Structures are given as structure tokens and as C-alpha cells.
Design a protein with these regions (language model features):
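Short, solvent-exposed loop/turn segments at secondary-structure junctions
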Residues: 52, 102, 125, 174-175
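Phosphate-binding site of ATP-dependent enzymes
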Residues: 70-145, 149, 160-168
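A generic fold-level signal
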Residues: 3, 53, 92, 103, ...
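Short hydrophobic/aromatic beta-strand or adjacent loop that forms the aromatic wall/cage
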Residues: 56-58, 105-107, 156
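Short loop/edge segments at beta-strand edges and connector loops
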Residues: 26, 99, 155
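ATP-dependent carboxylate activation and anion-phosphoryl transfer catalytic cores
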Residues: 128-225
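Active-site nucleotide/adenylate-binding loops and adjacent lid/helix of ATP-dependent enzymes
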Residues: 2-94, 114
């Protein structure tokens, strides 16, 4: 159910959690109908596959961009161009048509064991750096999700804000996110928390920092040969 983004959204809605409305399509006629409906309801819409990882297949749809934009941005596509491309799929891929939320996005990195959160840190990405928070409004939602799905290990839950600033659940990734190592700069070591729990070890924890900014640095090294 976590991997099926449509079923996941329905479960979140059933739990009265802030999910995002979505129409599932598996045929070009269904796609056209869903696009028409969602364009009438929302100022911006997007499409993403029911099954997928690392954002593969996600696009924001717009009537006002040229077909060539797809060669300049892999996340923005002309609506009619997307419909034409989808019509050529054999067999069709199940897709979701959704509102495109234009607010801030955050990633919550979590160490958990049998549905219980051991530690978590939220990351917000900016152009040149990331901010890590040990307290965040999405954490209470994460507790409900981790318990309901009995999550175990290092996972990541993604959220995005609407134009009113309210957070909505995007998805659960049942694996560590690429940037989860940034979180250690808060003083919270997610890997150590998980190992200590599983092996019944006593963990010495430093006093965590509430908010930190983390800047990635790429350094060249001279080969002595």
C-alpha cells in the first residue's frame, strides 16, 4: 500500500490525515477527463505514476508552455503533449492526476522499529543548502503513519505545503533518502538510534541542536602519482 500512491492516498484520507486529491487513470480517455476536471478545480496540476521512485515520471502540466520545454525541463510539460505521449503507451501505465502544490517541500528522515519512531529530523532544501529541524509540524503526522503502516528501519516521509501554508502528505519512501546523512549535524544519529534499538545497546546522545543549516562541499584531491 505504501508503494501504490493511489491506495496510499486513500488510506491517509481514511485516517483523516492531510492527503492530496488524486484521480487514477489507466486509459487516454480517462486521462483527458481527469485533466479537464482538475484544471477546472485547481490553478495548477501535475501527473505522476501510481508506482515509481525518485520522482521518475512526474511532470507539472501546463497549457501555456511549448512542446520544446520538455527538452529544457524534465518536470514541466505541455498538457496536450503529455496526452499525446500517453496515448502511444502500450500497454498504458497507471497515472495520477493531482493538484500541483506550489508551497515549500520537506523531507522527514526517520529511524523506526516495528511501528515506533526512535528519532526523526526534518530537512528543507534550499538552492545551496539544507535546513534540519528536530521539531516540525509534520512530526505528529509521521507518528500516525509509522504506527499505522508498522514501518521499520530507516525511512523517509515527504510533505508539501499548499498556498495557505498547510502541509500535505506526498509519500512514504521505505528506505533512507539521499540526503539523510545531513541530519547528523543536529546531533541526532539516525543510524546509531536504529542499531542501538535492534541490538539493545545503550546510546550516549549529545545535546541536539534545534535548527542547523548544512552546506555540501565538493573538494578536489591531488593524486600523488
Amino acid at each position: 500500500n505504501i508503494n501504490n500512491k493511489f491506495l496510499f492516498g486513500q488510506i491517509c484520507e481514511g485516517l483523516n490525515l492531510p492527503s492530496i486529491s488524486a484521480a487514477k487513470v489507466a486509459h487516454v480517455n480517462e486521462l483527458k477527463q481527469a485533466i479537464d476536471e482538475y484544471q477546472q478545480r485547481y490553478s495548477a496540476i501535475c501527473a505522476k505514476p501510481v508506482y515509481g521512485v525518485y520522482g521518475a515520471g512526474f511532470v507539472q502540466l501546463s497549457d501555456d508552455v511549448s512542446y520544446f520545454m520538455k527538452f529544457q525541463s524534465n518536470t514541466l510539460c505541455n498538457t496536450q503533449q503529455f496526452i499525446e505521449a500517453y496515448a502511444q503507451l502500450e500497454p498504458p501505465i497507471e497515472y495520477l492526476i493531482m493538484p500541483f502544490l506550489q508551497g515549500q517541500e520537506c523531507s522527514v528522515d526517520i529511524a523506526c522499529s516495528n511501528g515506533k519512531i526512535l528519532a526523526l529530523v526534518t530537512r528543507i532544501k534550499f538552492k545551496f543548502y539544507q535546513e534540519c529541524y528536530i521539531e516540525h509540524p509534520c512530526h505528529e503526522i509521521c507518528k500516525i503513519l509509522v504506527e499505522h503502516f508498522q514501518c521499520d528501519g530507516l525511512i523517509n516521509i515527504q510533505f508539501k505545503q499548499d498556498d495557505q501554508g498547510a502541509w500535505h502528505i506526498l509519500e512514504i519512501n521505505p528506505r533512507p533518502a539521499g540526503g539523510f546523512s545531513y541530519t547528523q549535524h543536529t546531533g541526532i544519529n539516525l543510524i546509531a538510534e536504529l542499531i542501538a534499538e535492534k541490538l539493545h545497546l545503550v546510546l550516549k546522545r549529545p545535546v541536539p541542536t534545534t535548527v542547523v543549516q548544512v552546506l555540501p562541499i565538493i573538494q578536489s584531491i591531488k593524486n600523488g602519482l
